[in-house]
Amino acid sequence: MSAFEQAAREQAARLRAEIAQHNIRYYVYDEPSITDADYDALMRELMALEAQHPELVTPDSPTQRVGAAPLAEFGSVRHAVPMLSLGNGFEDEDVLAFDKRVSDTLREAGLLGPAEQAHYFCELKLDGLAISLRYENGELVQAATRGDGQEGEDVTANIRTIRAIPLQLRAGAPAVLEVRGEVLMNRADFEKLNQKQAARGEKIFVNPRNAAAGSLRQLDPRVTAQRPLRFFAYSWGEVQGLSRDDAPAFDEASPGLVSTLPRDTHGGMLDWLAGLGLPVNVRFNHKAQGAEGLLAFYRRIGAERGSLPYDIDGLVYKVDALAAQRVLGYVARAPRWALAHKFPAEEATTELLDIEVQVGRTGAITPVARLKPVFVGGVTVTNATLHNEDEIRRKDVRIGDRVIVRRAGDVIPEVVGPVLEKRSGELPQFVMPTHCPICGSAIERLVDEAIARCTGGLFCPAQRKQTLLHAAGRKALDIEGLGEKLVEQLVDNGSLKTLADVFRLNAFELAALDRMGKKSADNLVAAIDQARRPSLGRLLFALGIRHVGETTARDVARHFGNIDAIMDADEAALLAVPDVGPVVAGSIHRFFQEAHNREVIRELEKQGVHPQAEAQLQSGDLAGKTFVLTGTMPTWSRDEATRHILAAGGKVSGSVSKKTAYVVAGEEAGSKLVKARELGVTILDEDGLKALLSQ
């Protein structure tokens, strides 16, 4: 090698190291060490040097982050160690209960003294996207989204464009290392991105998380390369190939945990990851003892939340000692040694411009607040539910008021109440209309009911549209392609008046509609044909009878066997169906007493719709047992799980009670899981459910 070539090699190495250091200062510590112009000059110098000497280009060079060619689609990646969810806490009492459970368990195991407090590692709950990075021999070889926790999407090409993520780890990296962390976008970067998007006439993102998600799921990595994404590591998955002294020994009872690692605490492991060159949020990571220590940190960060450079939606508390984590173990695919402590809903004030009413599938009249646009909880809110007339009276909300609007996460925004000191003069109270704003039919409110209803039935276009959408839904007739926009067109042009009209649709008529071509029309007609032989329970559910859910519809169908028997049944006969009470029996009886509803059944038969009898319940150990499903399961959808439970003779309910036999909890399980624990109900994960069903 000539002296000139050696000098070029050394210069390239120096530039790569300097740029990497500037990336760490900017993307990890949020403390730029040089100007953008100076940074760009370094990049140009390195690019020119590598252009002159292609043999100097390395996989981890910052010049290799510009983005590869566009992808046709994202592949799937099976996580070597599942990416688990966390239990949630919202109140101080939840944190106190968490600390008590942890402390009691550790004392029983002899890992905590009688007067000793548990030690925790606290982290910010970043509002971004969870990602798993896989390094082999120190080189980034794969990156995947969390997905369902078991399997995610392959976003390697996009992840390689993020400057905060090292393409090559420092010396000492194990043979295999899975790193878990969060991809996010700073608020300031988000604002700049939206300004650029607006200037180009392109999509404006709602919030930083939305922008980060959209950027990471670009099929063209060159677009991702232009987005200011950041990354912080907060955990690990598979680890292999450490030195003999540090070789990990995986505990099968605690997936994802190891009995030996380079460090024996969670905080120590993050220090180890940082030492390998991975970005760790050292600025805000914190150690605390006992519940009071956790709550003190929560209050501190809550006060500083608005001044943080990025969005967070809470804190995460983890038992620090890895040995203690193994003892505590898991429940329903979530660790017992960790808790996500969420911040309360965000609130803002704005003007209530109007109160309008919407008409639902069963004729329910729901008041909706039309608001002067206000940014709250990460989105711009213009509408909020007011639930019913009594709720409006209770809150004393009036058109023209300044009102408090609350939103938390993806929850529907709600009007909390008026700011009375801002009320000017005597504003009139809201009065529920006496006639439906859509069809003009009378609105009635039955005694002891909070909801007012339009009496128009299928004569009302609003109810007709919602009823038809319900009937086409996945849990009813499952007519793929018959969506909201299409139903709206077909109702408005007079093609759809009853459910039977769906089965009169033809490809020629459909192809002439807006946004419908021949292929879409043919596919829809095929889906309609497939729906001509539904189970009797699905057909009964599709009719949209008030108070009749899918489980009740199935029970009634199984009891009577055919549609004529159901139509002819009086209330006494309906009450003989298990779990059917007077309200449901009365609702079904009244529905089929209406001549036009019976006529719809006859028209369906003329169109070749012939419901099939429901399979009879098995008489095994699960016969009659009630299951409740909560959260997202790794491989089964709720419909699949429900189908398997019903096939085994079990029942599926939407609420937990003393009669519940099992709660099947997946990821992001909520209040149902909490209630199950309180009542001592047996809790299963998906694997446990499958094992139970196979017995």
UniProtKB/Swiss-Prot annotation:
Keyword field: DNA damage, DNA repair, DNA replication, Ligase, Magnesium, Manganese, Metal-binding, NAD, Zinc
This protein's record includes keyword Manganese: yes
GO biological process: DNA repair; DNA replication
Cofactors named for this entry: Mg(2+); Mn(2+)
UniProt catalytic activity: NAD(+) + (deoxyribonucleotide)n-3'-hydroxyl + 5'-phospho-(deoxyribonucleotide)m = (deoxyribonucleotide)n+m + AMP + beta-nicotinamide D-nucleotide
Disulfide bonds listed in the record: none
Domain of life: Bacteria
InterPro entries registered for this protein in UniProt: BRCT_dom (IPR001357), BRCT_dom_sf (IPR036420), DisA/LigA_HHH (IPR041663), DNA_ligase (IPR001679), DNA_ligase_AS (IPR018239), DNA_ligase_CS (IPR033136), DNAligase_adenylation (IPR013839), DNAligase_N (IPR013840)
One GO cellular component term: cytosol
PANTHER family: CHROMOSOME TRANSMISSION FIDELITY FACTOR 18 (PTHR23389), DNA LIGASE (PTHR23389:SF9)
Role summary: DNA ligase that catalyzes the formation of phosphodiester linkages between 5'-phosphoryl and 3'-hydroxyl groups in double-stranded DNA using NAD as a coenzyme and as the energy source for the reaction. It is essential for DNA replication and repair of damaged DNA.
NCBIfam families, A to Z: dnlj, PRK07956.1
This protein's name: DNA ligase
